[in-house]
From Swiss-Prot:
SUPFAM superfamilies: CCCH zinc finger. GO terms for biological process: DNA-templated transcription termination; lncRNA catabolic process; negative regulation of DNA-templated transcription, elongation; negative regulation of lncRNA transcription; nuclear RNA surveillance. Belongs to the suppressor of sable family. It comes from Mus musculus. This is Zinc finger CCCH domain-containing protein 4. Residues 53-73, 135-144, 194-218, 277-303, 357-368, 485-495 have a biased composition (Acidic residues).
């Protein structure tokens, strides 16, 4: 700002521009001339015009400077003369200006002398600076300025204005901005300035340049020079001003002229638009001066920059900024910078040439025109600039990584910038927009996997460097490893703290495991990513996070499919549909894969694999337990084998390709559980679809568990199932080894091992999404445990009631064997409730741990034994088996068939074990395995179906598990606002506003009243009318879920009602769904009995989730769990797509699509079964949601009151249980919930504990539409008691963010 004083403010009258100068004028205080007057706009104008004059003078000075101080010396006089002449000319402009100019000239002369000295000094300095010493004589700066004086002026204008502009605009610019500033300002600022110049300074230029331009310029120059001199003398010594002044001080004026001038209040003021620029310039100059101190950077850079800027400016001038630019700049910055520059140039060259005219010439010169000095300077400058451009001057901004000019930059970018020793966080995600220009490390970052294990699964395709470690890379690798270790330690601490609090967080996913599927290319994740590489879904990814950046991509890079390459099926499956979070197979990153893969290959590998290793290590056990729990856990721990449901079996399989996929196999989890049928399990559907998507295994996980357990019990998943193992056939053997231990362990600790937490928790754990942070997960598990306990108690209570009516669902008997695994409660339930047993078997199948959860489902489904089977079949089997069935056969029918089959099969026993599976498997897989008739066969088939459904199934389970965890909350919420809350929940996520009304329309109360009939109908219809059944199952399931959620008393009542109504409900269910209004009234009526009403409502809400589950069950695709996926895929994209579509549709029901459902009316039931399938749940979702949800609600509510609760509860329970019981289900369940709305799905995954509830709700919402609600209803049962109380609603609100909208 010193410059400000430097420029005497000419009377504004001096030139018309004064008005424009105000801006400069404002800066003018800084531009005060040495006289002490604030540079008035006039002065600024002068400055602007001065650029011409100055340019002339400056050119001379600049020339001198450029040429060396020599010319500067000559020009000083010449410039002075020119300036004087100009001054005289400008004299007319204003006396004051003239005096100022004269003073300035004197000062300038003195300054020029000083500057020459300074320049000489600088020259030596500059000479030190390669760039400076180049063409521009010593003073690269000065020279730069000189030759590029104009350019420089521009540069300065640019740069100071630019910088100033930046500085003006952002005042931190000074030196730093310069480069960029220069460049940018050059173009931008300059443009602005140009305009500014042209506008404000333009006038100044015009008037001042013409009038004042020359004389004033001289005077101004003199004054500025004097000012500068004073300034320089005072502080920087113009020359010493460093580049700023010295630079600017190309001549005496250089100082004033250059920035000096700019600096000189005028130059700068003018140069910059107004004072700020000047100030900025001053600042800049000061900085530059300091730059002198900074010389290396300042002078050198400045010189370089000056050169480049000068060149740039010159080119620009040449381009057209031309005079105005040169001058404009000159005027503007010109007077300040421009002047300094312009003048420097003009002055330098100009002076040599002839002063003022030269100034103009200089402009021309700059533009390419030029007079002697100008020309010379131009010559000098141009070559200089070009040389600079060509690499003489390194772009300082480029060095700083902020040059925006790119290839157009006038400065050299020919330097190899050292990369920041840090992995580019964008690169690891698979795309860095800066590509090779990125200052962070990309492919040159060391591959952690490769350098730590010596074997990178990505091989040559690895994103990271496999080159021998250098000191630098070793340091980076060590740092990364240290960070990983630190992160791991932190996680351990967190886990310890949680454990102290009594919370058993789910195991974290292996370092390489993540929620997101591993992208194919980023996969070459650097070893670092391996930890992150396979960021698991679970919160576990956090540990990997440190390396995540590298790992993240690597992990991601490991395409989930890639791992599936061997598992083309899974890959295909994935390709066919958009995987949901739960469905996503997270493949360990290359490193992880290597670690896991390396181990994976061996039986031990599966256990050993990092993810599986830890979890899998116990994989068998853990795997088994993890199965359900593992869903999430699997992601984290079983992660590797996750994919493989087949974890154990697949392990071998996995290692080969699953291995990376393993993570994928949340669903695959079941694979391991299939332990006995381990290989079969793997084959079960996952084998085929298994990998087809970890997910398929996931759904199977539910069924799978059932199958698995039943298998263990005797089914052993029959090799037939193993047939699915075809894919794993070779693995079967391998799995035998790892699988055996895994399987046995699995069976041993299926529940406890869920790794979700305590054995009891497994279900909850299973429900817990892996992506949840450990704390949340622990919380979630805890909640789930409580819910499970409650549900178990309920189931036990209900078991007796349901037992009577469960006989209807003898099919549940086959579940009993599954149930054995389900848990003690399952056993008691089996004894007490066959239906419950059935549902529980589902839970068992889902996982023993989910037995508790399963029990709730069972309880829910228990009311109606047959329904229970249906719901179960619809739900668990449907989800898993149906998915499979659908996958196998056409799921559209499969879905509906599943429910019916579920009934018929359960009845016939074909799918006895798989209540849902019977329908689905019967149609697709259930039927294929004739043995299925036997409970074990059914289980096996279930297992088989599971593979197809795995992804959906598991997600369903997970969601259910989550639901179970939040079942109490859900119930409350459901009770409070079954349909509306449900809608609300989805509304935010899925924009289910329409569904809300429709769901509301079919109020749960009405549903409860009619539901008893409807539910029974649904259940019965299911057996009688496969289509209806399918639809019914959806409805029934939702109802069942709802019923399960409702109080046991209600359930018993409902059961009675159901028994009475079951026969006639087959057709009505569809209609009732369609006719939600009656349902609503009924539901409302039931509302009278708070318990019934609330139960009904909760049921609907929960039923909705269960419905989704049943839907999923109905639709074998089991995409329901991944409804989002299904929705995205337009169906599961599995064979069970149709069935799943229904399910998904059901889930979709709550999806925004739900609102779409035009067929919400009568289609609900239908939609649930078949119609929705086509739409993939969109239409179905809409139709079902609108109507079916109401109906479902009815069903759900009714079921809670009626036996429907039993059947649907079973389904719901299945789903719910699956959700609770199998961790995979947890994943699946969230998926199911999320499947309805992808957002939901996503939400569940992000915050399992929270999401699960919302998921349940979300699921519930769709459930009403489809049978999905039932499963959730199943979940509701746990909350049944709570449902009655509005408090649950509050609880839910408190519990889940989504819940509050839902509650509302």
């Amino acid at each position: 700002m010193e410059a400000v004083p430097g420029t005497p403010p000419p009377p504004p009258s001096e030139s018309p521009p004064p008005p424009s100068p105000p801006p400069p004028s404002t800066p003018s205080p800084p531009p005060c001339s040495p006289d002490g007057r604030a540079a008035t706009p006039h002065l600024l104008h002068h400055r602007l015009p001065l650029p011409d004059d100055r340019e002339d003078g400056e050119l001379e000075e600049g020339e001198l400077e450029d040429d060396g101080a020599e010319e500067v010396q000559d020009p000083p006089g010449g410039q002075e003369r020119s300036r004087k002449e100009k001054g005289e000319k400008h004299h007319s402009d204003s006396e004051e200006e003239k005096s100022h100019r004269r003073l300035k000239r004197k000062r300038k002369k003195e300054r020029e002398k000083e500057k020459r000295r300074s320049k000489k000094r600088r020259k030596s300095k500059h000479k030190r600076h390669a760039s400076s010493s180049d063409d521009f004589s010593d003073f690269s700066d000065d020279s730069d300025f000189s030759p590029s004086e104009k350019s420089h002026r521009k540069y300065r204008d640019y740069s100071p204005p630019y910088a100033p502009s930046h500085q003006q605009y952002s005042s931190s610019h000074n030196a730093p901005l310069p480069k960029k500033s220069y460049s940018k300002m050059d173009s931008k600022g300059y443009s602005m300035y140009e305009d500014y110049e042209n506008e404000q300074y333009g006038e100044y230029e015009g008037d001042e340049e013409e009038d004042m331009g020359k004389e004033d310029y001289d005077d101004f120059t003199k004054e500025l020079n004097q000012y500068r001199r004073a300034k320089e003398g005072s502080s920087r010594g113009r020359g010493s001003r460093g580049r700023g002044r010295g630079y600017r001080g190309r001549g005496s004026r250089g100082g004033s002229r250059g920035r000096g001038m700019g600096r000189g209040s005028r130059g700068r003021g003018r140069g910059s638009m107004g004072e700020h620029p000047e100030d900025e310039e001053d600042l800049y100059e000061e900085e530059i001066e300091y730059g002198e101190s900074e010389e290396p950077m300042g002078d050198d850079d400045y010189d370089d920059y000056s050169k480049e800027l000068n060149q740039y400016r010159r080119s620009k001038d040449s381009r057209g900024r031309g005079l105005s630019r040169g001058r404009g700049r000159g005027s503007r910055g010109g007077r300040g910078k421009g002047m300094g520059r312009g003048r420097g140039r003009g002055g330098r060259g100009g002076m040599s040439k002839g002063g003022m005219n030269d100034d103009e010439d200089f402009y021309d010169d700059d533009m390419g025109d030029g007079g002697g000095g100008s020309y010379r300077r131009s010559d000098h400058d141009k070559p200089h600039q070009q040389s600079d451009k060509k690499g003489k001057v390194i772009c300082k901004y480029f060095v700083e990584g902020r040059c925006t000019w790119g290839d157009h930059c006038n400065f050299s970018h020919d330097i190899e910038l050292p990369k920041k020793r840090e992995l580019c966080k964008f690169y690891i995600t698979g795309f860095c927009a800066r590509a090779e220009n990125c200052p962070y490390m990309h492919g040159d970052f060391p591959c952690k996997l490769y350098h730590t294990t010596g074997n990178c699964i990505n091989g040559d395709d690895c994103m990271f460097s496999h080159d021998p470690l250098t000191e630098e890379t070793r340091e980076l690798l060590d740092k990364m490893l240290a960070d990983d270790a630190e992160a791991g330690a932190e996680d351990e601490k967190e886990v310890e703290e949680l454990k102290k609090q009594g919370i058993n967080p789910l195991p974290k996913p292996p370092p390489g495991v993540g929620l997101l599927p591993t992208p194919p290319r980023p996969p070459g994740p650097p070893a670092p990513t391996s930890p992150n590489g396979r960021p698991m879904q679970g919160g576990p990814p956090p540990p990997p996070p440190p390396p995540p950046p590298p790992p993240g991509p690597p992990q991601m890079s490991l395409p989930t499919h890639e791992p599936l390459s061997p598992q083309q099926l899974q890959q295909d499956m994935y390709n066919k549909k958009i995987p949901s979070l739960f469905e996503i197979v997270v493949r360990p990153t290359g490193q992880l894969a290597e670690k896991l893969g390396v181990r994976f290959p061996g039986p031990g590998g599966p256990s050993g694999p990092m993810g599986p290793g830890p979890n899998m290590g116990p994989p068998g056990p853990m795997g088994g337990p993890m199965h359900p729990d593992m869903h999430p856990d699997m992601h984290p721990d079983m992660h590797p084998d996750m994919h493989p449901d087949m974890h154990p079996d697949m392990h071998p399989d996995m290692h080969p390709d699953m291995h990376p996929d393993m993570p994928m196999g949340p669903g695959m989890n079941p694979g391991p559980p299939m332990g006995p049928g381990g290989p079969p399990m793997m084959p079960y559907g996952p084998g085929d679809s298994p990998h087809s998507g970890m997910m398929p295994p996931i759904p199977p996980a539910q069924n799978f568990y059932e199958n698995f357990y039943p298998q263990q019990e005797g089914m052993e998943m029959e090799p037939g199932l193993v047939g699915d193992a075809e894919d794993y056939g070779h693995y079967e053997e391998l799995p035998g080894q790892p699988g055996e231990p895994l399987f046995p362990e699995h069976p041993l600790e299926p529940d406890s091992f869920p790794e979700g937490g305590p054995p009891g928790r497994p279900k909850a754990g299973a429900g817990v999404p892996d992506f949840l942070p450990s704390a949340q997960r622990a919380l979630y598990l805890r909640i789930q445990q409580k819910q499970q306990e409650e549900e178990r108690a309920r189931r036990l209570a209900e078991s007796s009631k349901q037992d009577r009516e469960n006989e209807e669902g003898d099919t549940g008997n086959w579940y009993s064997s599954d149930e054995d695994e389900g848990g003690s409660s399952v056993t008691s339930i089996l004894k007490t409730l066959r239906q419950q047993t059935s549902s529980r078997p589902q839970a068992s199948v889902g996982e023993p741990s989910s037995s508790g959860l399963g029990d709730p489902r069972l309880q829910k489904g228990h009311p109606t034994g047959s329904r229970l089977s249906d719901p179960r079949l619809s739900r668990d089997p449907r989800l898993s088996r149906h998915a499979e069935t659908s996958g196998g056969s056409g799921p559209g029918d499969s879905g509906p068939s599943d429910p019916r089959l579920a009934r018929a099969l359960p009845t016939s026993k074909a799918e006895g074990s798989l209540h849902s599976s019977p329908a689905g498997p019967s149609s697709s897989k259930g039927q294929p395995p004739a043995e299925e008739e036997e409970g074990e066969r059914a289980l096996r088939e279930k297992a088989v179906n599971i593979p197809l459904d795995p992804l959906p199934g598991h997600p369903l389970r997970d969601p259910r598990s989550q639901l179970q965890q939040f079942s109490h909350i859900k119930k409350d919420v459901t009770l409070s606002k079954p349909s509306f809350a449900r809608t609300v929940l989805w509304n935010p996520e899925d924009l289910i506003p329409l569904p809300i009304p429709k769901q509301d329309v079919p109020p749960v109360p009405a549903a409860l009243q009619s539901l008893p009939a409807l539910d029974p109908r649904l259940h019965r219809s299911t057996p009688p009318g496969p289509p209806n059944t399918r639809q019914r199952p959806g409805s029934t399931d939702p109802s069942t879920s709802g019923s399960n959620l409702p109080d046991f008393e209600l359930l018993s009542r409902i059961l009675k009602t159901v028994n009475v109504n079951t026969p006639g409900q087959s057709e009505k269910p569809s209609d009732p769904r369609v006719r939600k209004t009656p349902t609503d009234p009924r539901l409302q009526k039931p509302a009278d009995p708070v318990a019934a009403s609330r139960a009904a409502k909760p049921c609907p809400t929960e039923a909705s989730p269960p419905a989704a589950s049943p839907s999923g069950d109905s639709s074998p695709p089991a995409t329901a769990p991944y409804d989002p996926r299904v929705l995205a895929a337009g169906g599961l994209g599995q064979g069970s797509s149709s069935g799943q579509s229904s399910v998904l549709s059901g889930i979709s029901l709550y999806d925004p699509r739900t609102p779409n459902a035009g067929g919400k009316t009568a289609e609900p039931a239908s939609d649930t079964s078949a119609q929705p399938k086509g739409p993939e749940g969109n239409g179905k979702g809409s139709a079902s949601k609108a109507k079916e949800p109401p109906f479902v609600r009815k069903s759900a509510l009714e079921q809670p009151e009626t036996g429907k609760a039993s059947t649907d509860g079973a389904t719901a329970t299945d789903r719910y249980n699956s959700y609770n019981r199998p961790r995979p289900k947890a994943t699946a369940a969230p998926t199911a919930a999320s499947s309805t709305p992808p957002p939901e799905g996503a939400t569940p995954q992000p915050g399992v504990h929270n999401l699960p509830v919302p998921t349940l709700f979300g699921t519930v919402k769709p459930a009403p539409k489809t049978g999905t609600g039932s499963p959730f209803a199943g979940n509701s049962p746990a909350r049944e008691g709570e449902q009655d109380a509005g408090s649950l609603k509050d609880v839910f609100k408190g519990f889940d963010p989504t819940a509050s909208p839902f509650c509302q």
